[in-house]
């Protein structure tokens, strides 16, 4: 059984945490501000720059959301203090990326360029037309936007063409072997 929910969250000095109505949490730091409303049955306290999450009983539902709530709070604190980043790499001949305004334009071998709207809370940078860096304070939003772009053209197993996370291993398959002809 996981004990994630029992760990306390240390809050850096630059981060300010406000708890309203026992379940509405506002976390503000140098990178920005995040707000979230958690389950009202959990007891969340902030004492001496340490956040603790307690559950009132050992019901199965309470056990499930206890660890999840603690992880979400930890991600909020880390996001407003350090931020989150995901880097994508585009592999393939003539596969390119560029930014026009609040749109990410991808050329991925389709008959048309693919346009993806960049959310307001994210910063997207394209390096050398083949590397996309996604930065933001909300871990979920950064991950969703990265996954959405990878899904547009997943790496294929023969040549590895597509969009992948930097450091992701793409397993390569052997291509068809030539048919042997017999000479008599």
Curated annotation (Swiss-Prot):
Biological process (GO) annotations held by this record are: cytoplasmic translation
**One Pfam family named in its UniProt record:** Ribosomal_L6
Named from the GO MF annotations, one term is: rRNA binding
Q: Keyword set for this entry?
A: Ribonucleoprotein, Ribosomal protein, RNA-binding, rRNA-binding
Its cellular-component GO annotations read: cytosolic large ribosomal subunit
Task: Fetch the Gene3D superfamilies from UniProt.
Answer: Ribosomal protein L6, alpha-beta domain
Which domain of life does the UniProt lineage start with? Answer: Bacteria
Assembly, in brief, is: Part of the 50S ribosomal subunit.
What role does it play? This protein binds to the 23S rRNA, and is important in its secondary structure. It is located near the subunit interface in the base of the L7/L12 stalk, and near the tRNA binding site of the peptidyltransferase center.
Q: Which family does it belong to?
A: Belongs to the universal ribosomal protein uL6 family.
In Swiss-Prot or TrEMBL terms, this protein is called Large ribosomal subunit protein uL6
Q: Give the originating organism.
A: Aster yellows witches'-broom phytoplasma (strain AYWB)
Q: What is the lineage of its organism?
A: Bacteria, Bacillati, Mycoplasmatota, Mollicutes, Acholeplasmatales
Q: Give the gene that encodes this protein.
A: rplF
